[in-house]
């Protein structure tokens, strides 16, 4: 039995597999995982591409024994494929794995935070041997920029939902965060901007 108090999130199916397509869900060692366990999605089919153009290194990393290791994370359940995120985006904080989308969803729902204008980032800190968690969140009004009460609420909500502590939280004015050409919040460019703007005061 699972308590109704346990936080959950709805995940939509990407659909069932096309005829002639095989999918495996694998761990870091590329060993198959059980159904409903999250891992990297590997695909094999007759129409699979043979490699990346003039990029043998990426080809060798992604293609092996007829399988394409996509870098996407997901799981299989009752014949349906569910995609949960990107492997490269996974945050590893003090030995625990966190999906940035989970952090962003929780913070976005807090009153005073601009919905959908939050990004959770991992910054590799060699001095402690793990990533530090950075959360950049745009606020709905200028009066909430760097507001200590709102910052405390964000930290408390995240700790309560995910048992996760933020190393560096920035409450920012609207339109501070950078987006991709498709309108999504851009992770790498925002990490770069964070380090350029706040680098000297970062933990």
Locations of regions flagged by a protein language model:
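Short conserved micro-motifs at the rims of enzyme active sites and ligand-binding pockets
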Residues: 53-54, 146, 181-182
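Short, solvent-exposed cationic patches
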Residues: 54-57, 105, 200-203
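Conserved C-terminal "lid"/linker of ANL adenylate-forming enzymes
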Residues: 117-124, 134-135, 155-203
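Conserved ATP-binding/catalytic segment of the ANL
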Residues: 11-36, 40-100
């Amino acid at each position: 039995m699972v308590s109704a108090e346990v936080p959950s999130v709805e995940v939509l199916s990407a659909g069932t597999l096309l005829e002639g397509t095989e999918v495996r869900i694998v761990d870091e060692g590329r060993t198959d995982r059980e159904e409903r366990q999250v891992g990297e999605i590997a695909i094999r089919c007759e129409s699979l591409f043979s490699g990346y153009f003039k990029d043998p290194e990426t080809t060798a990393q992604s293609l092996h024994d007829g399988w394409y290791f996509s870098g996407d994370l997901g799981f299989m359940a009752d014949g349906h494929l569910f995609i949960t995120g990107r492997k490269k985006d996974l945050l590893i904080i003090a030995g625990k794995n966190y999906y940035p989308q989970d952090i962003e969803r929780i913070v976005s729902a807090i009153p005073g935070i601009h919905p959908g204008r939050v990004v959770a980032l991992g910054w590799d800190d060699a001095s402690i041997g793990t990533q530090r968690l950075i959360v950049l969140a745009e606020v709905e009004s200028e009066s909430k920029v760097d507001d200590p009460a709102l910052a405390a609420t964000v930290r408390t909500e995240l700790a309560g939902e995910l048992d996760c502590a933020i190393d560096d939280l920035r409450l920012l004015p609207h339109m501070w965060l950078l987006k991709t050409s498709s309108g999504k919040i851009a992770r790498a460019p925002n990490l770069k901007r964070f380090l350029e703007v706040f680098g000297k005061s970062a933990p």
